[in-house]
Amino acid sequence: LLCRVLDGGKLGSKRHVNLPGVRVNMPSITSQDLVDIDFGIKNKVDFIALSFVRDKEDLDKLQKILNKAKSKAKIIAKIENQEGLDNIDEICQSSWGVMVARGDLGIETSLTDLPNIQRRIMHACGKWGKRSIVATHLLESMIENPTPTRAEASDVANAIYEGADAVMLSGETSVGKYPTECVKFLKSIAAKTEKFNTLDYEKNLISSSDWQHIGITAKHLAEQTNADGIIAITRTGETANLVSNAKPKGFPIYTFTN
């Protein structure tokens, strides 16, 4: 790959190369990915995040590898380019959860469109009842500083208002100077935001099964009776997930299993 430097600066090692708008004909799972996946399977990881997911077929390839190894690891689809965004509905249906990987996504699409793209992905996750993770540049300034900016605090809160199930740090905790403080700030912002969140996510949810209706009904009963919590009896955890999809407010979901 030959490049001409137009605006010079410091280039770190092992940096990614982004080609916005270009459909790159490369395998979704590389030889190094296979090594990493094998390591994860042997160490019984709970989740495997697949980068630059373009469509359902990318996820099917990974699922076949996991099935062959009899691994129970769940797949997280990282949305990082326009092709993945265009196929977001089929990707949601074929994965356990979706990550809004804002770093590469902001380069591969448009930085000014990124807030709307994030909302679009979150809406799709809510519609299909899939877990959503917002990642990258949440508290970026805390790599060097002990407190976040006001804009960063608002950004984290906005992700939670949009229905994020998880907000994930990266550089802040991997190379930052204040990893513990980052986690504490993120936890505090999330807890306080959830108390004031009045959005009804259930309206967006596709009730595609009787089980999902039961989850929604459990939420309604708990809210109407001012319950202290919801108890879900489950073997796989899916019953608790069905209740969680409706995002009940103000009380926990307790899970009992054998």
Region roles according to the model:
Residues 1-258:
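Non-catalytic helical/linker scaffolds that mediate oligomerization, partner binding
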